[in-house]
A protein has these predicted regions:
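Divalent metal-dependent catalytic cores for phosphoryl transfer on phosphate-bearing substrates
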Residues: 34-37, 46, 51-167
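Low-complexity, glycine/alanine/valine/leucine- and proline-rich hydrophobic stretches
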Residues: 154-203
Length: 203
């Protein structure tokens, strides 16, 4: 009960903080994200592509998500490659570490940790964040970010709506046309691997 109460208090505090941050029509956290992108030389074009796909997919599976949940996913998408400045190898781990420890005005430590966890699970195995994935909101955010990263892996122009997703309770069904699949064999292969990863996870 104590942990639950603490979680509710943290959540309420973050909601109040977010409201205060946005009262003048601007959110200092947006400026913090832009500064981190500049500081860590993030590929802005790729960040926008991934953010666009992640936002589109998340709206389909979580239409009633809170504005904060949507924004957290977009911020994580915007910063998912910040660790490439350290190394291209395992950059998701470097990105997660940096976001979890960097000074980012406007963000609570708890919110930074959630976003760092999202970034860490953008690729690779899912077991590293079993506890986080037990939270449905986090699991759907993670799925949408991972799918967006896969969809944008070629780092070129994309059709955001070429890949659709349908939700059935806790299950997800990917929908795409045969022409798109034929023209994107590498992406199709990665999507099949992704489906297998979630299947092994029991999702």
């Amino acid at each position: 009960r104590g942990a639950l109460r603490q979680g509710v208090i943290f959540d309420l505090d973050e909601r109040l903080q977010a409201t205060a941050l946005q009262q003048d029509g601007h959110d200092i956290r947006d400026a913090s994200v832009r500064e981190l992108q500049r500081r860590f030389i993030v590929d802005i074009s790729q960040a926008k592509r991934v953010s666009g796909v992640a936002e589109h997919l998340y709206a389909l599976v979580e239409p009633d998500a809170t504005p904060e949940a949507r924004r957290e996913l977009l911020w994580a998408s915007a910063l998912h490659e910040m660790g490439m400045m350290v190394s291209h190898h395992d950059h998701h781990r470097h990105s997660a570490y940096l976001l979890g420890h960097v000074d980012a005005p406007g963000f609570s430590q708890r919110q930074q940790r959630r976003m760092a966890d999202l970034i860490q699970v953008q690729r690779g195995g899912l077991r590293k964040l079993d506890l986080g994935l037990a939270n449905p909101q986090f699991a759907w955010q993670a799925l949408c970010l991972r799918l967006a990263v896969i969809k944008c892996h070629a780092r070129g122009a994309i059709d955001t709506r070429a890949l659709q997703i349908k939700r059935d309770n806790d299950k997800a069904l990917l929908v795409f046309g045969p022409a798109w699949a034929e023209n994107n064999p590498r992406t199709l292969h990665l999507l099949r691997e992704e489906a297998e990863a979630w299947s092994r996870q029991g999702s």
